[in-house]
Amino acid sequence: MDSATRQHLMIAFFLSFFTVGIPYWRIPYNTVNLPEALPVFGLIVVGGAAMMLRLQTTATFWQIIKVMTASVPAAVFARVVWDGFKDPSSHNLWPFEIAVVLPVGFACAVTGVLAGSLIAAMTGKPQRRKKR
């Protein structure tokens, strides 16, 4: 993976991390109900960023899925850590929180990557293959 691809993946990860995280972090902890508490706009950004990565970078299908999927549980885990500093007993079941949002992030990432692959195929853009 070249440095430009790595940079694009990092930018897309943090863009998705903050668009999911900031609205989610503002919800009071006692009213959070996952996965409904995740902002729809943030999840759309995850899929859109995955689609753009597929169209514009040399990152592979699975690299994009792994990075973009991780952005959603990372935002939830950041809240777990922050709330854990304030009240150590607040997130006793944090592994379940991660397990609940992981499929949501995966679904958004896969949808975006598949859409990007479909658009690339329809426009005649060559698919980039990983060099061996």
Indicate residue ranges for each PLM-predicted region.
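Interfacial non-cytosolic loop connecting adjacent transmembrane helices
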Residues: 29-35, 75-101
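Loop-to-helix transition at the N-terminal end of transmembrane alpha-helices
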Residues: 30-48, 69
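Canonical alpha-helical transmembrane segments
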Residues: 42-66
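Transmembrane alpha-helical segments of multi-pass membrane proteins
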Residues: 66-77
